[in-house]
């Protein structure tokens, strides 16, 4: 697994930091579901980052709890290094970020593979108390199937939030295959299904005979 980080060198004034800004004190719990597996997050208080490493075989989600010392505008940088253990190469990776307090997303990007871009849709009005934003990462060099070359997607983003000293964050990720791959996979599934039905019909005819 590639052990790279997105290093965001931004002045305190640019991030809107002030003497009254909160500090994140810990990321005490995490969970994962679906086709996503994550090792224990590594939180670094000095630079307010959390590093996430894991692997993904299909649509899945990761949840974090975040604690701060005051409720005033902390910023957390989230770095991900995810191995592709699915059955197809990724050329797009759509991340949904949801929190239980209002927040903004900034500085989204990909370290590796090269050539990827990121577009951000900021959270709108809450639904059932949950605010949700979207980051669409678009390739670039495809993320190949692990353990081939370029089989880890190393990406990151920042979230700035406020309103509490205890937060929940859910990162839901949907990897997208190369154009035409869905057709190939669907055709393969249809062919397999057709072969199975034909085989069952043949067995029934043999029994009748």
How should these model regions be labeled?
Residues 1-7:
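Bacterial N-terminal signal peptides that target proteins for export
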Residues 23-175:
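Mature extracellular "passenger" or substrate-interacting domains of secreted, surface-exposed proteins
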Residues 194-209:
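C-terminal membrane-anchoring or membrane-association module
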Residues 178-197:
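A short, hydrophobic C-terminal helix/tail in secreted or cell-surface proteins
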Residues 9-16:
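Bacterial N-terminal signal peptides
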Residues 17-22:
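Sec/Tat signal peptide C-region and signal peptidase I cleavage site
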